[in-house]
Amino acid sequence: MALSSTFLNPLVSSVAVNPQPKITSGKGFRVNCLIRTQQTVIKTDTKENAAVLTPGKRVEKEPSVSTVLANYHADWDPFEATSTPIYQSATFRMKNATEYNEYYYSRVANPTTSTLEKIIAEIENAEYVTCFTSGMSALTAVCELVNPGDEILTVEDIYGGSYGFIENLMVRKAGITVKRVDTSNIENVKAAMTNKTKLVWLESPSNPQLKISDIREIARIAHAYGAIVFIDNCIMSPLLSHPLELGADIVMHSATKFIAGNSSCMAGSLATNNKELADKLLSYRSATGCGLSPQDAWICLEGIKTLPLRVEEKQKNALTVANYLDNNPKITKVNYPGLPDNPGYDLHKSQSKGPGSVMSCETGSLPLSKQIVEDTKFFSKIVGFGGVGSAICLPWYTSHKAIPEPEKIRMGITKDLIRISVGIEDVQDLIQDLDNAMSTPTF
């Protein structure tokens, strides 16, 4: 079943769909590039999606990503279990007195975790993937690629956890210089780069303002200086954006979010096509013991089977919610790259396969924003995103709480800014919930 099948279902015809041409995703996978911009129904022609059948002739075609993920299993398992076995073992017997087998110590590698790494590599179109205990431990490994005296250039409105790590450990203890710039303006990037810049740290879209950076052009500029380009791609999921194909060197996902999908484990992954970088990242993981446990890897493996369905449904709902907010007089601004009037709309469309399911908005009133967050019933008040359920928070007080107030103001993060992760619920229930939360002021 192709990723676009949701939009062939008459039961979901209330949402606008503008299907784009199919784009190859991963190694032999195909997903539809879907940017929906209206609330008028545009039905996909089922004929163009139907297989061409020739009686008596065997036809081989590349399976869609949803088909591959639903059928993926550990081909090394002698019992051919449909669910990957959990190798809950710290050690594995050696081949003989002087030779290891492929697996010998789970701090270095584990069969269950390796299976997850292989399937993430497939959908990332990456040669190498290394999994970690969390997204933050993955970020820590990336920072080990720079040395005292080096410079890191980061996106301005960076995730609060990344800001805290860079500021407290890299700047104060490691002697690293950090430059924070609005990377959505390419001129800022050009002006900030020097021969000391060894790492360019991007988020596109950024968290929480959903700003869009030109990954291709920034990669070109950074590589001219010999810098590594790293992308925190958490907001997009590995299905909607492939930064490695745009010139990035390393792509990070907090697998806690979209990959696992149920907010039931912590996990992180780093993908690259550079063997030297991959060896360094694996060496760091092995030395520090921050490799993903087989139990958490298994949770991610179970979750990733439904990743295409979840990403598609969440994105479909998000487009409807974003349009609702954009036309609501109580909302002063909506940050979402799926809206045509978003400053980064065209750029994002050129380097992704969809706008995703995370957005933020402003009301101009902290009391009203607090009321919305507190009064909604179907939006969990949590700091995470990417799960099956909708989530809502005020970044000033949650995900970006640790950032000093002057810095948050400089970044453009306001107290009334609301971040929303749209889930798979009935979208009309979500809109009614938001409408009810805004209907009667309690302040």
Curated annotation (Swiss-Prot):
Q: Does the keyword Transit peptide apply?
A: yes
- One GO process term, biological-process aspect: transsulfuration
Record-level Gene Ontology MF annotations: cysteine-S-conjugate beta-lyase activity; pyridoxal phosphate binding
Q: Which domain of life is it from?
A: Eukaryota
Q: What does this protein do?
A: Catalyzes the degradation of mimosine, which is a toxic secondary metabolite found in all Leucaena and Mimosa species.
The family database entries (CDD domains) matched by this protein are listed as:
CGS_like
Describe the temperature profile of activity.
Answer: Optimum temperature is 37 degrees Celsius.
What this protein catalyses is:
L-mimosine + H2O = 3-hydroxy-4H-pyrid-4-one + pyruvate + NH4(+)
Q: Give disulfide pairs as residue numbers.
A: none
User: Mind telling me what this protein is named?
Assistant: Mimosinase, chloroplastic
